[in-house]
Amino acid sequence: MEKLTLTPISHVEGTVNLPGSKSLSNRALLLAALAKGTTRVTNLLDSDDVRHMLNALKQLGVNYSLSEDKSVCEVQGLGKAFAWQNGLALFLGNAGTAMRPLTAALCLANADSVPAEIILTGEPRMKERPIKHLVDALLQAGADVQYLEQEGYPPLAIRNTGLKGGKVKIDGSVSSQFLTALLMAAPMAERDTEIEIIGELVSKPYIDITLNMMKIFAVDVDNQNYQRFVVKGNQQYQSPNIFLVEGDASSASYFLAAGAIKGKVRVTGVGKNSIQGDRLFAEVLEKMGAKITWGEDYIEAERGELNGIDMDMNHIPDAAMTIATTALFAQGETVIRNIYNWRVKETDRLSAMATELRKVGAEVEEGEDFIRIQPPASDQFKHAEIETYNDHRMAMCFALVALSNTAVTICDPKCTAKTFPTFFDEFSAIATV
């Protein structure tokens, strides 16, 4: 296995232009494919997840052209639901942002033509990532979805019986991606859909991204305080002609944290008016003691005396991981709460984070839905080999350990290709050893 050792970094300074957001990229491609008209998607992320979505759309008969650097994609919208030849199988890797929305969108296919089945599968880890809450909701809306192996998990078989709509209940407590998938499919259902949320809805800012994007593609949703969503049926998405993908606010977190710990770093491509909830990560850094400056198209973090915090971070689950490694450089303990959904991501992130933080010298308590971190003294960091569990965010979070007086070795550094293939190049560009 490839390993990368980062030597201790004494200072960071510079500007990082962020790659496009993964969740925005894949939502934009899917909406563009379903919409009427041609959409030019710009600042598209070039990563594994996006490649899986593009491959799937091509197999589903969507025509698109991709620029040489893969940052611009011109998509010819179908203006209707997908259709396919019986027996088609789509391999979606470990891309939750492709698997969930496509599962719902494929249920729209109508059997006016010949009955046809499609199979959605992926890497072994994908078969461990729950999808039951989404499938339960789709079944209530009249879809025909079956599990091919373990109940509640991919791979799935979907038949083209159409999506009727009607009253649907969905559990909101595990992942907002299930609701996002259902919301994006609902306007093209035969009838109006009324979605009732069971339990506390997690990651609300991700739902705001979805609703915002649907509006750009000419569909409005009646959001009743995140408890109920009413979507009119039989609608058609309309191309906005151009859709600019914002820089990835989750990816911004590593560089902003580095600035807060040891220098001054500006990230561009995301700013104070961003539609991504993870921009709020900068406010958490500010609470800890960093100096933050907000621009229209940038956020800047400057070193401050950092103190530990105790905070519910359900609203920024991906960026909250970066707080866990930032906590190594704060005075006193940090507690990150209400993050059960870390357990159903690319790996069980709660368990992985606790294990790897202990290796570098922290005292850690791992709860069912929280993590408590007591940092090591500044001269007590240990050189460790960090397992990354094929999880891009683990690799990027633990790069911050190099801001101590101790080197850190990252196993399988190329796993960052899921969202940020050039991460380590960008990180070394702002670092002074």
Swiss-Prot record:
UniProt pathway: Metabolic intermediate biosynthesis; chorismate biosynthesis; chorismate from D-erythrose 4-phosphate and phosphoenolpyruvate: step 6/7
SUPFAM superfamilies noted in UniProt: EPT/RTPC-like
Keyword terms: Amino-acid biosynthesis, Aromatic amino acid biosynthesis, Cytoplasm, Transferase
PROSITE patterns in alphabetical order: EPSP_SYNTHASE_1, EPSP_SYNTHASE_2
Enzyme Commission number: 2.5.1.19
One Pfam family named in its UniProt record: EPSP_synthase
GO cellular component: cytoplasm
Residue numbers annotated as active site: 318 (proton acceptor)
Keyword Amino-acid biosynthesis: yes
GO MF annotation: an example: 3-phosphoshikimate 1-carboxyvinyltransferase activity
UniProt record, GO biological process: amino acid biosynthetic process; aromatic amino acid family biosynthetic process; chorismate biosynthetic process
Alphabetical list of InterPro entries matching this protein: Enolpyruvate_Tfrase_dom, Enolpyruvate_Tfrase_sf, EPSP_synthase, EPSP_synthase_CS, RNA3'P_cycl/enolpyr_Trfase_a/b
Subcellular location per the Swiss-Prot or TrEMBL entry: Cytoplasm
This protein's record includes keyword Cytoplasm: yes
Residues annotated to bind 3-phosphoshikimate: 22-23, 27, 175-177, 203, 318, 341, 345
Sequence positions that bind phosphoenolpyruvate: 22, 96, 129, 177, 349, 393, 418
Similarity section: Belongs to the EPSP synthase family.
Role: Catalyzes the transfer of the enolpyruvyl moiety of phosphoenolpyruvate (PEP) to the 5-hydroxyl of shikimate-3-phosphate (S3P) to produce enolpyruvyl shikimate-3-phosphate and inorganic phosphate.
Subunit composition and interactions: Monomer.
Protein name, per record: 3-phosphoshikimate 1-carboxyvinyltransferase
Highest classification ranks of the organism: Bacteria, Pseudomonadati, Pseudomonadota, Gammaproteobacteria, Pasteurellales
